[in-house]
């Protein structure tokens, strides 16, 4: 995958990116490192599911959970220099005064040990989620499941 010139954030993806999104979310080589956290989150919130919404010709990919929890997704696509596809995602929900990041995944090339580690994609994704949290009335903290059974809590600065 060529080096990305820019990242774009979106709550859904065009249907043609389904295979790439599934690979990043469900068949990611980095999952083994996070299995304890994934197991804990899925037990409480349900496993993530990629669903198709919209009418034929305008279908989009969204996330939900097996337990039907109301979640939102921050998909990240790389654009430029030949890259135009999903490279990351955060699935999150709101609980009282917190946005809770349930599942996070990045393409292996953009992981901390990938060939594009310098892009710091996970940090960019978390900053974007924090920016979203700042705009939501009543949200005071981010809770991040980063591979453990309990989330890390980060206070939102306004």
Model-derived regions: residue spans:
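Generic structural motif recognizing short loop/turn segments at the entrances and edges of beta-strands
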Residues: 1-9, 69-72, 83-88, 137-141, ...
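Acyl-donor binding region in acyl/amide transferases
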Residues: 96-157
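Conserved N-terminal entry element of GNAT/NAT acetyltransferase domains
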Residues: 1-33
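Generic structural motif
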Residues: 12-18, 79-81, 109, 149
